[in-house]
Amino acid sequence: MKQLEELLSTSFDIQFNDLTLLETAFTHTSYANEHRLLNVSHNERLEFLGDAVLQLIISEYLFAKYPKKTEGDMSKLRSMIVREESLAGFSRFCSFDAYIKLGKGEEKSGGRRRDTILGDLFEAFLGALLLDKGIDAVRRFLKQVMIPQVEKGNFERVKDYKTCLQEFLQTKGDVVIDYQVISEKGPAHAKQFEVSIVVNGAVLSKGLGKSKKLAEQDAAKNALAQLSEV
């Protein structure tokens, strides 16, 4: 924790008052489950809070930055900014991946590299920062870490995976693409959806995500990866 505190202080000028919040933000459920007798808290509730404040701040930013963009355009751009893959990238940029506490099994299976875990970690950190320092501190942090990438136009140049898949398949002829929810698991604040892509009646790929939209994007990403190998 001491090294993490030093990182936050030197790189982002952030000093937590309540270090318990910071420690909880960097504790994965797998670690908490392995230390159940010690009553260790995990970061899912902070992730829920961080997701909400991230959506709000990015929405405010896009609304002010792009007065001529439509609601649909802003929604699409926001979804690219806050998607799991993007948030995992920001976690790595901040070196957060080096400090998350994982259970032994999750560590061995490569959890420290997994986008799902790192994206959730980034949101949990935002939730902890909100509770400890307030929303203006979260705004300052995002302005330092995320906003420069938005202003470079990095996210506007990225097509979503569903669009890319549709364009690819349409080059092969007429196709009917259907996204179907296979399962929905977990509590309301930590849902896990599984979605399959059915093309002309045959299952092409499957994907996972915290929402139906994210699961669809993951399934489309997996489909594109499969098709590139053919």
Curated annotation (Swiss-Prot):
Domain DRBM, chain residue ranges per copy: 160-229
Major localization class: cytoplasm
Active site: 51, 123
InterPro entries: dsRBD_dom, RNase_III, RNase_III_dom, RNase_III_sf
Intracellular or extracellular location(s): Cytoplasm
Source organism, top-level taxon: Bacteria
Cofactor(s) in the UniProt record: Mg(2+)
The protein's name in its UniProt record: Ribonuclease 3
Species whose genome carries this gene: Streptococcus pyogenes serotype M5 (strain Manfredo)
Organism classification: Bacteria, Bacillati, Bacillota, Bacilli, Lactobacillales
Annotated gene: rnc
